[in-house]
Amino acid sequence: MEVNILAFIATALFILIPTSFLLIIYVKTVSQNN
């Protein structure tokens, strides 16, 4: 099965960008509570 590299990158970005965004918000919230 041939993998479309552009589709793979687009999917990776679509998953990683919101995940990293939520992770940054979580870290900021935790650091503010302490």
Swiss-Prot record:
- Its transmembrane ranges are 5-25
Indicate how the chain sits in the lipid bilayer: Single-pass membrane protein
Query: Gene Ontology terms, cellular component aspect?
Result: chloroplast thylakoid membrane; photosystem II
Q: Which InterPro entries match?
A: PSII_PsbM, PSII_PsbM_sf
UniProt KW S-adenosyl-L-methionine keyword: no
Give the subcellular location: Plastid, Chloroplast thylakoid membrane
Query: Which keywords accompany this UniProt record?
Result: Chloroplast, Membrane, Photosynthesis, Photosystem II, Plastid, Reaction center, Thylakoid, Transmembrane, Transmembrane helix
Q: One biological process GO term for this chain?
A: photosynthesis, light reaction
Report the protein's function.
One of the components of the core complex of photosystem II (PSII). PSII is a light-driven water:plastoquinone oxidoreductase that uses light energy to abstract electrons from H(2)O, generating O(2) and a proton gradient subsequently used for ATP formation. It consists of a core antenna complex that captures photons, and an electron transfer chain that converts photonic excitation into a charge separation. This subunit is found at the monomer-monomer interface.
NCBIfam families named among the record's database cross-references? PS_II_psbM
Q: Which family does it belong to?
A: Belongs to the PsbM family.
Q: How does it assemble?
A: PSII is composed of 1 copy each of membrane proteins PsbA, PsbB, PsbC, PsbD, PsbE, PsbF, PsbH, PsbI, PsbJ, PsbK, PsbL, PsbM, PsbT, PsbX, PsbY, PsbZ, Psb30/Ycf12, at least 3 peripheral proteins of the oxygen-evolving complex and a large number of cofactors. It forms dimeric complexes. Detected in both etioplasts and green leaves; PSII is only assembled in green leaves.
Identify this protein by name.
Answer: Photosystem II reaction center protein M
Q: Which organism was this protein described from?
A: Hordeum vulgare
